[in-house]
Amino acid sequence: MLFDAALLLSFGGPDGPEQVRPFLENVTRGCNVPPERLDEVTKHYLHFGGVSPINGINLALVNELQVELDLPVYFGNRNWEPYIEDSVVTMRDDGIRCAAVFITSAWSGYSSCTRYVEAIARARRRAGTGAPNLVKLRPYFDHPLFVEMFVDAITAAAASLPAALRSEARLVFTAHSVPVATDRRCGPALYSRQVGYAARLVAAGAGYADYDLTWQSRSGPPYVPWLAPDVGDQLMTLASAGTKAVIVCPIGFVADHIEVVWDLDHELRSQADAAGVAFARAATPNADRRFARLAASLIDELTHDRVPVRVNGSDPVPGCLASINGVPCDLPHCVA
């Protein structure tokens, strides 16, 4: 399969205070999120001037991709400007015929994969005749470079702790929670199992035999079951058991979303300080050059029909495959 362009497809985020509420309404439309929760998250964004940190990160990643790939690189978002629909129209007008789509989500699942596939389909319909073929690259939660970046981040975070606490620090992984029903929708529990498997790979690479896997940033009605335990609740459990230091690894995020810089760096750190627990947060990949190399590796798999590159050579948690033009791949959890 030959590509004449690449498209970085991300989540999107506001670029100013006046954009925050419309952005959040875009993200949560149809999800039955209480208005009080939107009010709360609005304050989180306004704390940072109403600007999402992922905007600058994505532009930096586009630059890294342009260095790594011998292709023009376009950029579009699912939930905010530049929308993927507008980007694909531009690609059509530029004469692009077939583009590899790299999404800033490492996982399978409805929220982390299927909704991006749906966005690709919408964008091609909007572009109409002459729309380029869009090939979404596979999830990469077990790619060696994905694991390596988080291993290095944990090692650096541990080094930032007081020397006397490093050996006893508890490693805590966290990812964005979703409703249990949503996790089962592309099941059985595909998203949570992939996160768990990636955490196991990263912990082993960083030299940790024991760790905790937690979830964060739930936003739905309180009566709806979401993935648990919550990272804050687990922190309090650890503190009560005498844990003196934690290393929090946001393995579910490939960039510093507001859920990282507010929910973890602000709220969770404050909780840890109040409980007398030393806190270190591992970095996300952001615009690490290795992230661009990872994208190039996925493109190479399709261009040269190579076996997917995985840490252990096989996929014990079968995920989505590459998909074309917004059509789900052939696996049962995608077409069900």
From Swiss-Prot:
Fe-coproporphyrin III binds at residues 52, 116. Its EC number is 4.99.1.9. Fe(2+) binds at residues 176, 259. GO terms for molecular function: ferrochelatase activity; metal ion binding. It catalyses: Fe-coproporphyrin III + 2 H(+) = coproporphyrin III + Fe(2+). Its main location: cytoplasm. It is found in: Cytoplasm. Involved in coproporphyrin-dependent heme b biosynthesis. Catalyzes the insertion of ferrous iron into coproporphyrin III to form Fe-coproporphyrin III. This is Coproporphyrin III ferrochelatase. It comes from Mycobacterium leprae (strain TN).
